Amino acid sequence: MEILNNYIHFLNSLLINQNIFIPDPFIIPVFFIIHVLLIFILYFFYKKSQKRWRIKASFKYLKKIESITGENEFQLTIGYLRKIDPFIFEEMILSRLKLQGYKIYRNKRYTGDGGIDGKFKYNGKLYYIQAKRYKSYITKSHVINFDNLIKNKKVKGLFVHTGKTGKGSKDVENKNMTFLSGKNMILFLKNKKNIKDII
């Protein structure tokens, strides 16, 4: 957003410094439309660059958690994952799947995705992914909504989270939806366990 603000300031100062006189009343709305279009284009490329940056960062974060070892490896890794950018967390899951040789589908944007944070294919079947960073128990309604989504789309689902799975949420789990959390999630992200051995 700072880039856009700088751009707007630049255009406004340019008009003032050049003492541009616009006599035609139709020029002002035309200029306004062009102005808005340029801002939209800049915003689009800004969001796209943010997406590329997060994908690139996800591979670095995977390397980082691989380096976390020792007696408190589990607690340290979970604590680390709970603090990172939630969108990078989504990309980390997809990046690990890609590194494990699966066909992945990244979203073009992070909002308005309909509850889907990515997709991948395994054994000819399409899986939807939902990734959530929790510090405590997961929200049951999130699980129910995701389960309804995959049922309507007739696909399988992978619900990945950093929290705790309560009994109410576990009751929703079925043959079409798998939870990936706790040690299994860490082993997967560290490439010590393949996703095919989990789903």
Positions of PLM-derived features:
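Mixed-charge (Asp/Glu-Lys/Arg
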Residues: 1-114, 119-199
